[in-house]
Amino acid sequence: MSEQIHNPASEKEKGRVPQYLIISILTIFGIGSQYFSNLSYILNQTVIQNGLHISSNNLLMPSTLSNLAFAFGVPLGPVLTKKLGLKKNYLFFVLIFLFGSIISAVSPEIITLTAGRIIQGFSAGILFLTILPLSLISFPNKIRNTFLFMIITGLFGATALGALFGSVSLTIDSWRWLFYLNGFAAVLCLVIGFYALPKNKKQDNKKADKTGLFLYSLLMIVLAFPLCNLTQKGFTSIYIWPFLVAAALLLVLFIYVDLKAEKPLVPFRSLKAAKPFSGTVMAIASHLALVIAIAGINGFLRNNLDLPFVYITYFWLWFFAGIVVTAVLKTLLYDKLGAGVLGFIGSLAVIYVSAEWRVMGPETSLALLYFQVACLGAGISMVLVGGALGTALAGDIHQASMRSVTLHSIRNFAGAVISPFIGWFLMKQNAVNYEGIRESLSQDDSEFKLQIMKLVQHFIGEGLPLTTAKNMASYELVANAKRSAVLGAYHQLFTILLVISVIMLIASIGKMVTGKGRSLVQKQTRVLLPAPKEKDLKNSVS
């Protein structure tokens, strides 16, 4: 990027706020608002469902389409920034995000809520690579490592705060105020950005590949229908698999076209070297791990532990605490150890958590869960940010933006696609597990009768009559079977998380092997003047 950043020293002389702090605020509130909305929506779906009087199946549509819209907008950000200029592009799409937030906040039905979430997702996707690269280069060289603290606590922190505020919305049984918070953040960005963003000229020398843009747009449209209906209809439905096959063909064609294009929308060729490739795998795998972990642990807390909402709030506070720890460690150690070593450490933390969660039960202590979710937040953020930054700084620095566009486009696309698959997987495994439990009980009549007898005696001991005790025993047995079935589904999901965390570990090792890479804080080389000749010294003394 060639935007002019004001010299921090000159700003200090004028008594102004340093430019890097202003850009950081615009980055956190401009992009983080979408992450905040995503996580708060996941947690407070019950409140929204009751408020809009809709079925649980309809609740998946706003989040699925919002994620797709965000993924669609990510590679368009740099294209529109070059065409419109950074300031105009940023302010325009922040305004669009504000409109989306207002529509979501006042939505009387699921259709308008979905429209608002799509607008939010698309505009935030555009903003992502509009402001994020500027944020990095706005930091002065000597403190550029503090960019890591800003990006981790700001963007990952927005994710954690979204989960935290989503828990609060469950407690107070209200959800619209969360979108008003999004609107407030957008207004703040509009005011600050209008006065503080540097004015820059358009840089549109060559137009982006129109064929690639058309194929990418068509891919998102084709994917929208099956992803919104996958959980309800399943893979075998005629409404699902033909669309997924068509989407797969479009994806292959899009990659082929972009590889051949002179000005590709997503420059896949920029990742062909080993060093950026390993960093990309780190970032993508850790992003998928985050999506899977949040879906699994949120379901476990609600369905198997049945915690009061206040304890769920504490849970996500510990998640945020782990993120803050990583932010500090990354800031202090990134230039010394590199992305590979830190990613290795973070991967081990995620492996530990996933191994524990795949065998945990309702008897698990809250204190242990708090510690484990802190490890999860610390580990995933360490791997993801290290992989993303390590990819950008791997190789020719003039192609850093191209590598970032490719990495973040793939990462967000994969995250948008996997979420509906997680819902389908959990529903399918839950049904399979439940049927297996029912068959095992019906095949072994003696065990079934023994369990019923124990439960009947338990309820009679509590003072219930025999008929009521038998009914309660049957109900309790079915409820226990359902809880066991859904717990088994979460265990299987956490097994997938374990596999992905191992991939994160292998990619981190690959990053270590290929070298630490460029440091954030560059050492300043002093220019030494030649020593004066002895004769000149004598003359100057005399």
Please describe what each predicted stretch is.
Residues 171-282, 286:
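Hydrophobic transmembrane-helix bundles of small-molecule transporters
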Residues 66-73, 123, 154-158, 322-323, ...:
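MFS transmembrane alpha-helix packing/gate-lining sites
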Residues 416-513, 518-542:
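Hydrophobic transmembrane architecture of multi-pass small-molecule transporters
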